[in-house]
């Protein structure tokens, strides 16, 4: 028995070493990464074709909190969750203002492995950076200026969104005026404790998605001590019907002008759905490599290996489409950490099948893979 256990441990160790080496081979090299950092919004075809009609304004709200409670861990808003939605809104004819509870320059979380073309373009966009650095204090935001509110994710939102008086007022006023309320990941914390003029809770009997308990506790096992609450639990306690998708994959809910996304992989669809709720068909864009991989992984989770394999082969046959293999590999690592060995082997098969599919980081509409730290 001891011999069998030793052999099993050795095999697992070899698999782990091999997986790490494989992952490292997928990460873009220094030259590619440096070129990516020079991305400009003016070079992205999707943005070159932006709607010129003035369709109104959207207020994006980010956290002002830079520390996770008493844990001492730094936090802020997620840059990718702001940048990608920002450009979808701009491309579709909306001016975007940026606000935060305290105003001024908010704390930001930037992970180099997460960053893609749109994200670096945002960092290099003088107009966008001026709005971010001088974010509007929420007390100065006028609800009548905006057709929609968008609450950006980031763990800091768990601390300064839920009981913020200005947020409650803005959300209630914009919603009751017929506007759209959008949020992603930890952003839906802003929708807690919001009451309408008739005394009902905004979220009562509404379908809502956010970062799930499962996702939170996998990343931060002591999340119940780090955060004042678990977001999924609080949304359910608020009377919402919580809609959870597979872990770390796209899931959006759209109910009565409230559009919410589960995690960072839901930003693109959440932003497009917000445009639809505002009464417009979103401007077409080439789907990113990351989104394609999310679709493959969702097909695997919901319909099995066969469907995922078929979709992957279809994507490989289309010249404009690319696949983010690193994201598939990361899900394989999660499966290994959960000791789901059959799932791990099947995801490895998908990686092998992907063959010459590549991580497209330098194309004008592709996004580099992100880690699981949301």
Task: Give the positions of each predicted feature.
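Extended, subdomain-level signal for the structured scaffold at the beginning of enzyme domains
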Residues: 2-176, 190-209, 214-374
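Glycine-centered, small-residue-biased loops immediately flanking beta-strands
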Residues: 179
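Catalytic, metal-anchored helix/loop core of enzyme active sites in primary metabolism
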Residues: 185
């Amino acid at each position: 028995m001891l011999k069998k256990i030793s052999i099993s441990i050795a095999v697992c160790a070899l698999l782990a070493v091999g997986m790490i080496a494989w992952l490292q081979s997928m990460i873009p090299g220094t030259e590619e990464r440096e070129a990516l950092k020079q991305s400009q919004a003016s070079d992205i075809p999707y943005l070159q074709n932006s709607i010129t009609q003035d369709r109104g304004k959207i207020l994006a709200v980010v956290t002002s909190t830079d520390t996770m409670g008493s844990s001492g861990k730094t936090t802020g808003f997620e840059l990718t969750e702001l940048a990608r939605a920002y450009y979808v809104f701009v491309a579709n004819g909306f001016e975007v203002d940026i606000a935060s509870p305290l105003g001024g320059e908010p704390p930001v979380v930037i992970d180099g492995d997460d960053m893609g073309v749109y994200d670096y373009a945002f960092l290099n966009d003088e107009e966008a950076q001026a709005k971010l650095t001088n974010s509007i204090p929420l007390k100065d935001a006028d609800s009548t200026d905006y057709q929609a509110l968008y609450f950006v994710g980031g763990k800091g939102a768990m601390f300064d969104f839920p009981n913020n008086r200005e947020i409650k007022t803005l959300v209630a006023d914009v919603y009751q005026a017929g506007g759209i309320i959008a949020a992603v990941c930890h952003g839906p914390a802003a929708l807690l404790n919001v009451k309408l003029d008739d005394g009902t809770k905004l979220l009562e009997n509404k379908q809502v998605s956010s970062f799930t308990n499962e996702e939170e506790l996998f990343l931060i096992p002591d999340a119940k001590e780090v955060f004042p609450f678990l977001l999924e639990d609080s949304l359910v306690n608020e009377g919402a019907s919580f809609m959870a998708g597979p872990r770390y994959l796209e899931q959006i809910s759209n109910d009565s002008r409230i559009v919410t996304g589960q995690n960072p992989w839901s930003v693109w669809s959440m932003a497009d759905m917000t445009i639809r709720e505002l009464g417009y068909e979103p401007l077409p864009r080439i789907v990113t490599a990351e989104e394609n991989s999310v679709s493959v992984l969702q097909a695997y989770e919901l319909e099995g290996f066969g469907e995922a394999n078929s979709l992957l082969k279809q994507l490989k046959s289309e010249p404009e489409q690319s696949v983010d293999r690193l994201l598939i590999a990361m899900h394989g690592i999660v499966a290994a950490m959960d000791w789901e060995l059959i799932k791990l082997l099947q995801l490895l098969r998908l990686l092998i099948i992907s063959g010459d599919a590549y991580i497209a980081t330098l194309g004008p509409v592709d996004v580099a893979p992100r880690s699981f730290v949301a």
